[in-house]
Amino acid sequence: TDVTKGFTEQFGKQAEHTFFAPGRINLIGEHTDYNGGHVFPCAISLGTYAAVGTNEDNAFRLYSANFPKVGIIDIPFSDLFQDKRSLWTDYFQGMARVMKTAGANFTHGLNVYINGNLPDGAGLSSSASLEMLVGTILNSLFDGGFEPLELVQFGVKVENDYIGVNSGVMDQFAIEMGRANQATLLDTNTMKYEYLPVEMGDNVIVI
């Protein structure tokens, strides 16, 4: 996914940074995370990509190749706490406002080009992937200092309080904390977890 080329086409300049957040599958424990149960998810190679550059507009200027008809959406910093727009940008705005409330200091604007290869509605957590991507972008470029588990909780808060989805912690956790070739046994009640190898060899999992 060449997001740098797409960034240049949309914003007329070169991207300064690239980011990626995976999707996830869950091997055991469907619909148990929001009840405090155990889950066994792992991150996958498909996910959401971003190319990012700075602007001087004190705004987030956002474009998604997955929603080209929407075009570029501007979210001025002064509008972060306005109502959601029922667009994909609500996930970006939600993460930005939660992080701002937690102490993040956005010192300059960003142009952001996003392209994901996770099918919408396929159970691979495209929305959580976008949330963790945004959290990583803002945490990295504005020296937020937030720990990975804090970003996980920010994503859950966005889903529950801003988007309005009654979801648990598994999706964001699996994406933010995932490791290559390992699944994570997570107790969503205590948040204790351990990594276990997933060595498939010549075997495959059909979902």
Q: Model segments located where?
A:
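Mobile "lid/hinge" segments at catalytic clefts and subdomain interfaces of large enzymes
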Residues: S167-M170, A174, G178-I207
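ATP-binding N-lobe of GHMP and related small-molecule kinases
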Residues: T1-L124, A128, M132-P148, Q153-I163, ...
